[in-house]
Amino acid sequence: KSSRIEGTKTSIEEDMSDIEDISPEKRNDYIEVHNYIDALNQGIYRVTSGELPISSRLIKEIHSMLLKGVRGENKYPGEYRVSQNWIGGSMPSNAKHVPPPHFMLDELMSDLEKFMHNDDLKIPHLLKIAILHYQFETIHPFSDGNGRVGRLLIPL
């Protein structure tokens, strides 16, 4: 369902097929869904094995996997954006949301990590996840793929 939000359309039958059996016009959607599955599985493995906590490093790794060979692959996969972006509108002045400037991203993502791993906070886990997701989307650290990464972080 997360991929469908982005306009990606595949059926379960297509998702279970080999790429060679997918019609050429649907292959990008197929690859995008499989990238999402691979990134989610990698994230779950890295976190549950203790190999890597949910961190900027893991978030960048997941982002890189999500954008491999699909829409957004030319927008610095695995790297935080290096310029201002905005959501909606044709320029920042008429945008629905203007995220923080790129030079603040390392500090903001570090703060987000600290929030994630702060066990002293006495709030329900579901509320903590919702706040994390909202803050991640507000920061919008990547040039593309923020929605996909943000939704993928929820089950981690």
For the regions a language model picked out, list residue spans one by one.
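FIC/Doc superfamily catalytic core
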Residues: 1-156
